[in-house]
Amino acid sequence: MHGVAMPHRKKLPPAYETVSPREASPKQIQGNFAVALGGLAGNNAHGAGVIEALYRCGRKPRLISCTSGQIRFTYAYLRGLTPGSEVNPYSMLQRHFNSAQPFKDLTDVNLNFKLMTWPFQQIRPSVPEFSADMLGNLTRSMKQFLANPRDFSVWREMYRMMPARTLVSQDTLFDPDVFSDIARLFNADTGPDGHGIGVMFNAYDFVKGEEYVFMNGTAATLTGHAPGAGSGSRPWIKYQAITEEAVRNALRLYEYGFHEEGDLLDGAYLRGLILSEIPNKGNGIDTIVVGRPLASCWLGDAPSSLIELRDMQTEVNFLGSYLGEKGQIELINQLLRTGRPVAPPANATPITILEVEMDRQRGWWEYVLEDEAVFNSAFHRTRTEICPRLELPMAA
């Protein structure tokens, strides 16, 4: 209402017990469910908690869709399916804490640590590139002034001076095979030693305005989308097989700038959670467990600064794409249930969505740091609220 100030409300999430390292390898029984994990900077611990809890409950999905940083944790999950493996979502997160933010949740100390140890960070600040990038932008402004001084704006050019590149990936510097290893494991889904789980993730071509959804063989079979084909109802979506280059592109952040070849970026910027490909009549999936890296509404104080406003804009953008995906599934459920306003499509199938959403407000500055409390919360809520609702197939 006009004249009424937006309320300020601060939700304090409950504290959860710290999760301990794996001590057992419970038998994994594949259920009639898929998992959709959304990646978002410092909130990746949330999805890691969801998938780790499912493992410790012995619930194995038929299909995993993942975006951005959740690609790494899906890789860790698949590695962790091998009994005795030292790589799993829990251990990957702990290694991140030890190497990139050893001072727990102390923001300033951890950020200073990242700056001082940037040569050794997997994703580092663009410290050595900063001067050259600034000079490049200054040169661009000077050329525009000389070419058209009448339309030149000092204010506009001041805002354009800060470089787009603020981070640099050093993935292949520390592990030259990191992207090929991820692709190889994702594609190791069939055969007697295969993990048997469909995997798909996405990337976005910002020049063509197209989304690429990369799938392994099991995912292609479950969804009915063959690699090389396009979407019949959404012509901007193309389906491709998983390759090393696909993994590299799907992990390419805005903040890396645009100095590298290619036009594909992290697909989470376009579609943070991949849901609509999962329902397909006859594939045996009737439930999707969704690891939402954001809450469904604003939980913190109303924004009063520009940086807080940028956080709200980011959250609304990510929520919008997810609600579109979820709404499509709920519409099909309604058509199947009522037959109105039209009959459902021939391949329609009912889907139950079980959400594990973020239970706390994490702002712009928290996006550069993971939080163990986020992992603990997602883990315990998945174990107590989601796992009991996942029916396991009856024994033959």
Language-model features: where?
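Catalytic nucleophile serine of serine hydrolases
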Residues: 68
